Amino acid sequence: MADTTGRIPLWIIGTGAGILVIGLIGIFFYGSYSGLGSSL
């Protein structure tokens, strides 16, 4: 993983996307369980 010049490493993109998806799913379920799912 030394040749990361000019491009973003693929594992950073995968990690960021995974965290984003997990965060969105968590917020969605938290909002629906809290009664705020209808406002989203």
UniProtKB/Swiss-Prot annotation:
What are the UniProt keywords, alphabetically? Chloroplast, Membrane, Photosynthesis, Photosystem II, Plastid, Reaction center, Thylakoid, Transmembrane, Transmembrane helix
Entry-linked Gene3D superfamilies = 6.10.250.2070
Gene Ontology cellular component?
chloroplast thylakoid membrane; photosystem II reaction center
**Where found?**
Plastid, Chloroplast thylakoid membrane
Q: What is this protein called?
A: Photosystem II reaction center protein J
Q: Output the InterPro entries linked to this UniProt entry.
A: PSII_PsbJ, PSII_PsbJ_sf
Main location as per UniProt:
plastid
